[in-house]
Swiss-Prot record:
Gene responsible for this protein: rbcL
Record-marked site positions (Transition state stabilizer): K318
Binding sites annotated in the UniProt record for substrate: K162, R279, H311, S348, G349, G350, Q370, A371, G372, G373
Source species taxonomy: Archaea, Methanobacteriati, Methanobacteriota, Thermococci, Thermococcales
Family: Belongs to the RuBisCO large chain family. Type III subfamily.
Cited CDD domains: RuBisCO_large_III (cd08213)
Cofactor remark from the record: Binds 1 Mg(2+) ion per subunit.
NCBIfam families per the UniProt record, alphabetical: PRK04208.1, rubisco_III
Protein's name according to its UniProt entry: Ribulose bisphosphate carboxylase
Positions of modified residues (N6-carboxylysine): K186
The keyword Lyase belongs to this UniProt entry's keyword annotation: yes
């Protein structure tokens, strides 16, 4: 007996430029460059592979699969490629799992031969998906409250060189930096636990030093201690921090991964700890403007999961990026977004006191300003470098010229003599 089967046409079935996405669909924006196929077919292949598809034509399609097909509803030429917007039914996504979302929309699609380049530009989750994520435990307002800093950027620094310090040496530097006015002492991305500086010894010593400085200065000080490692080790390290009275942990979120970050968001909530998100390794896929994933998409995912602050760039300094891109990321992190609290953007990379007026003019006061070499390289030492940074920030907030402020701040005066004032031009790639 012959069974009649209807052949299911593929790829172009995923393209409907007259389609209007529903309120409960997740929208993803891509830039892509076709490789030997039409733009419509390339876009359809992206939608297919990231939703229900396979490389071959099928003879049967389950009813749920039909209802779960992604739809390309926008397709326009852009530079050497095209911009596509794709609507995804929520039946494709597991609730509360960034891992599963990224495996779909940023997974196998990047390996397709039909594409020369593919870049995930942004994604827009509907509330029905977003409601399964907690977002930051503290966010900008919560951090300002426990730090006691109401109307200026927070200051942070990393002891330089970033490796090689014994626990005692690190503690001595921490005392000088905190005493000079730094709010947040930060480990660097690769500084975790070593024979010359064990995490367990460092966590005990540094919080004793912090308590001493707080008593001497009357200011709240915190330590962004790097707990990154296998997730079971991260959990133990977070518990040590909480037991010592710490308020923060730092995680290298890209190398740790979304799964580890989501798990640690639950752990840190139980322990009452804020998460400082370092983005080490992000440039492996954010830097190429024609391929990879944007920093905006990473920052959005990190905010959904619940980091309290995250590095985004400076537009000035050695790690400078494009001003418009960084401003867009920062504006998103600070915006109202359903129940998800705002996140502190962190500016870092080649910053020094002379850049403070320009940096604050560009990005405002809701910012964590991290200066490493720009503080540690002060000719009179790290305490003087810390004071110079604080004085420069105070001047910028008060609208006072740095040269004028330097008349009453010998530390700032000497710093400006060493590194000068900002000469940065903004709005272009630096």
């Amino acid at each position: 007996m012959m069974v009649l089967r209807m052949k299911v046409e593929w790829y172009l079935d995923f393209v409907d430029l007259n389609y209007e996405p529903g309120r409960d669909e997740l929208i993803v924006e891509y830039y892509f460059e076709p490789n030997g196929v039409s733009p419509e077919e390339a876009a359809g292949r992206i939608a297919s592979e990231s939703s229900i598809g396979t490389w071959t034509t099928l003879w049967k399609l389950p009813e749920m699969a039909k209802r779960s097909m992604a739809k390309v509803f926008y397709l326009e030429k852009h530079g050497e490629g095209y911009i596509a917007k794709i609507a995804y039914p929520l039946t494709l996504f597991e609730e509360g799992s960034l891992v599963q979302l990224f495996s779909a929309v940023a997974g196998n699609v990047f390996g397709m031969k039909a594409l020369k380049n593919l870049r995930l530009l942004d994604f827009h989750p509907p509330y029905e998906y977003l409601r399964h994520f907690k977002g930051p435990q503290f966010g900008v307002q919560g951090i300002r409250e426990f730090m006691g800093v109401k109307d200026r950027p927070l200051t942070a620094t990393v002891p330089k060189p970033k490796m090689g310090w014994s626990v005692e040496e690190y503690a001595e530097i921490a005392y000088e930096l905190w005493s000079g006015g730094i709010d947040l002492l930060k480990d660097d991305e690769n500084f975790t636990s070593f024979p010359f500086n064990r995490f367990e010894e460092r966590v005990r010593k540094l919080y004793r030093v912090r308590d001493r400085v707080e008593a001497e200065t009357g200011e709240t000080k915190e330590y962004l201690i790097n707990i990154t490692g296998p997730v079971n080790i991260m959990e133990k390290r977070a518990e040590m921090v909480a037991n010592e009275g710490g308020q923060y942990v730092m995680i290298d979120i890209v190398v740790a991964g979304w799964s580890a970050l989501q798990y640690m968001r639950e752990v840190t909530e139980d322990l009452g700890l804020a998460i400082h998100a370092h983005r080490a390794m992000h440039a492996a896929f954010t830097r190429n403007p024609r391929h990879g994933i944007t920093m905006l998409a990473l920052a959005k995912a990190a905010r959904m999961i619940g980091v309290d602050q995250i590095h985004t760039g400076t537009a000035v300094g050695k790690m400078a990026g494009n001003y418009e891109e960084i401003k867009r990321i920062n504006d998103f992190l600070l915006s109202k977004w359903e129940h998800i609290r705002p996140v502190f953007p962190v500016a870092s990379g080649g910053l020094h006191p002379g850049l403070m007026p320009e940096l604050i003019r560009l990005f405002g006061k809701d910012l964590v300003i991290q200066a490493g070499g720009g503080v540690m390289g002060h000719p009179d030492g790290p305490r003087a470098g810390a004071k110079a940074l604080r004085d420069a920030i105070d001047a910028a907030i008060e609208g006072v010229d740095l040269d004028e402020k330097a008349k009453s701040s010998p530390e700032l005066k000497k710093s400006l003599r060493e590194v000068g004032l900002s000469k940065a031009k903004v709005g272009v790639q630096h």
